[in-house]
Amino acid sequence: TDLLWGLRGGGGNFGVVVSLEFRLHPLTTVLSGLLLYPLDQARTVLHRFNEFIATAPDELTIRSGFLQIPDGQTVLFLSPTYCGSLEMGEQAIAPLRTFGTVLVDQMQSVSYHELIHSNDAFTPKGRHGYLQTQSLEGLQTETIEALIEQGLPLPSPFSAINIHHFHGAASRVGVSETAFALRQDHLMVELIAAWEPQDDEQRYIQWAQNLSQALASYAFKGGYINLLSEQEQERVRLAFGSNYERLLDLKRKYDPDDVFRSTIGHLAPNSLTR
């Protein structure tokens, strides 16, 4: 029982899962796509987005952020996904089109398979990348200003700021029910620095680190566990929060020699955090 608890958020710290049975839920098509807005309307759109998601239904999740389109222009995007009837989905996302001037509207009904693979083109083989994350309770004036004033311009056409919307059923799980500790509605800001192999990586890494630091004082402690590096052990501890000591006990019990150490969210059994 303890091991199963630890696996739900504790990653590969305790072993390798060789067999898994899980329940599927039918989901054939979803309403999804991109809405693009001009950069000079970003503050207004993001404030309205922040107000809107407070009452969003479970069936709707909305990513937001900044990206560069093929003509070199940086734009703000909203990317809703509605898992339900097309008619209800259209009603749910209709207000988003009033938040500002919609430059491009790519909302459409797509298969779930298409949705899962819709970002494949952004991660071609050979491209280098570096990620930082901060989780915010919401967007306030200060965080919006940090995103715009310190995050832009993006350091390359392949880089982006991706704001993930976490809410619904996952927020109704008790903090101690699984190892994953952040069980409340929040926004996870993913800072994606990407560059070609011949470029100077330090410029891109510095961009992500500087923006992450600018957001840190407004963020929950830690970060998104799946995107924390081996060098961010203190953030790993903070991300697991009140579940960290229980996870550490499991690590010491089942893997005291740290055989399973090449893992995201690594727990060192000899940790001196007690």
Name what the model sees in each region.
Residues 1-274:
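Soluble FAD-dependent oxygen oxidases
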